[in-house]
Amino acid sequence: MFISVVLNTEYMDIASRSKWYLKNLLHCKENGWILITHEYLWKHFEEIQQDITPRLFYDFEMRPFKAEEVKDVEQYFIPDRLFEMIEKQCGSRTEFLFEMTRGGNPELETVFQGILDTIKKSHPNEPIDGIFHCLEGFEPLRNVAKVNDIPIISYVFSALRKPHGYRQTLYSANFGRLYCGDECEKKWHRFQSEDTQLLLYSNRELIAIFGKDRTLPLIDIMAASPKYEINVCGEGFDILPHIFSRAEYCDEDIYYECAKYYKRSQMRNRQHPIHLDALQISRDEVHNDPAAWILSSKRMVATCSQMILKAALWNRIPVMPKNTLPFSFMCSKDITDENKVPLDFLNFYLFCYLIPNDLMFSGEYWQWRMTNPTETEIYKRHLDFYIEKLNLPKSILTEQDEPTRFKSLLKSRGCDEELINILLEDKHDFDIDYNTASSRIMVNGKSYWRLNKIENGVRHFHIELSESADTIDFYPLDDVAGCARLVSVSVNGKPVDVSNFADFRYMPKVSGHYTLPFPPTADKTIIDIAWDYQSNKEFLNAHS
């Protein structure tokens, strides 16, 4: 039997935990587990139910359910007045979070112990196998779990999430602490000591296995020389108490260090969406996907951002000055460093350390993990899961030739032949604007992405498909807002009249597109589009 705990451990109100509460409530129903959470969530359950949308089920990968289905889940609630009292005594939310991460709290420990005692009395023949905890657990709960000899499994989304376009959601989870590399480092050393005899997959293969459809064309520029020296990936909050209480480090330290070595023109910055919301800055002018931004710089630095994993995946230099993530011990500490993450570790981290969504909340899986399987056994179980779930070619287990494996992986995803050939050629002898690195085109309702090559200051989009076209919709910016105009379009070598699209117009994020008029096509469609781009700021300045 497992217990699932959902508590508010950040600078958010308790209501913000409602999504995780509902997700865990469903897992508890399906597995016969017990849930511990805030009293507030129980009191406001009807309101929470009313706010449920199909988007919630999609984002958190849950099946739809109604209140009647989960009413018999055994739940225990921490009184709101207790947290309110402790926070009032501390004087601020920051000091409260520091206290919860630094050490114990007698009042909370008494409540946690009382709940565990009640559970043990109610289930005398069912030992508590473990406690799942969303995000880093408070020290009072850790203290009580340790006294009762119950392991805590802390978990958080990794940088790879299926609702964001990746092929699987992977979780970072372990029996120790989420935001340090101690347990991961031990697992890595064990893995190295084992006779694994496993194939190593290249960066581009790993992207072909896990990556988004929209970013596959960017593989073609992975080996290109970046334009900038360093990217700074900002956190959602100015201070992260669970980090600062141990490392005494935050984003301000990163900016301070970067200013010593780099000019502003050598740096790029990407803020967390939570930070943008707090500053009332629209997310529309920030790309949903950061891959092109990552590729634009030689290295990336962060305090604690999971996005650092994407830098390693895209073969850029990840810099983590402090021990704040599971893989930080393998990252450079120096923001001027040139060392990339070794490929064998990247394979280990993706296939062995991170846990696929379908296994993350499986009691059978975690009971198996508690039998201390070898790291190689964990790696193989995860890899077998991906082969089945993602319909990967089993030849990737034995085929020694990397280009052959890579081509097979692309085919298994349903990539079109032109894209496969482009990526196999591995050419990158052209200029690119990382702000408009790729565009999307929909032909007969199916989306395709290609790079935009810069020639004489104009972006050129080219695609060849082995099918006739009944409809063509062109999304120049795709996942970011801005302004665009068409310079010229041809289909199968025949010019298309785009005079109506010759002026700059605003392109909303995601939905902004041109529906193109075109001549009838045969059994093959070749599309060439030349277009210009202006940021919203440039457009407004030009028309002010």
Regions found by a protein language model. Name each.
Residues S172-I219, M330-D429:
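Leloir-type glycosyltransferase catalytic cores
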Residues S18-N24, P64-G181:
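Active-site and donor-binding regions of nucleotide-sugar-utilizing enzymes
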Residues P217-H275, F351-C352, P356, E364:
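Active-site donor-nucleotide binding/catalytic segment of nucleotide-sugar enzymes
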